[in-house]
Amino acid sequence: MNKYYNMKKVILLFIVAIISNTIAISQNSEEAEKLLNKVSENIKSYSNIYINYTYTLFNSEEDINQTNKGSFVTEDDKWKFVMLDVTRIFDGDKLYTISPDDEEVTISTQNPDDESTITPNKMLYFYEEGYNFEMDIVQYVGRKKIQYVKLIPMDSDAEIKYILLGVDIEFSQIYKVIETGVNDTQTTIAIVDFEVNLPLEESLFVFDKEKYKDYYMNILD
């Protein structure tokens, strides 16, 4: 009698533990999603955004450790993006890629479905689709409280293991993005400056052909 009673008790406790764990995971996921939704809403409330950042690529096995600086500014559907000395300007119609090393300007129509194309929108809203969320660690950087959210790709064939997205809790802004690939390459984007609602000149998103009259114009479409 005691034997069967104890067995039932163990099974019951096991079921309760599973249910409790499932509820905790669900609450954790909801809390993470709520935080990311707040970040998205906050970003979309700004008339424009200017960001300076560092971009670090690290893989100890491949002996890779590279850090570069970049910046971008975006307003409505227009943006300007600078990285590795290459400037990209999207005026709402055409995309201009300016490469000083090649002395070339490539003019094309932006394809929003092209996954290889880096745009400010992809950097600011990449987490909105294709991931499961869960709350991760909290770090303090000076007086800043940074809450990390772990993003796990829904696609089992994704080249990404997971992403840690650091959020500045006080301002509901992205602070850092740490991506770990299936090959253990770690890509880190750290926000250095995050400015919003600036008085921008209209010419900022205009390609001035006169400045590049000695460059080769590669018109794709």
Question: Which ranges hold each PLM region?
Answer:
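An acidic-aromatic
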Residues: 69-118, 187-188
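Sec-dependent N-terminal signal peptides
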Residues: 10-20
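Flexible, surface-exposed loop/linker segments and immediately adjacent secondary-structure boundaries
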Residues: 110-145
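N-terminal leader/targeting segments and the immediate start of mature chains
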Residues: 22-63, 77, 211-221
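Gly/Pro-enriched, hydrophobic low-complexity segments
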Residues: 131-138, 142-220
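Positively charged n-region of N-terminal signal peptides that target proteins for export
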Residues: 1-10
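Beta-turn initiation residues at beta-strand->coil junctions
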Residues: 55-57, 83, 99-100, 178-181
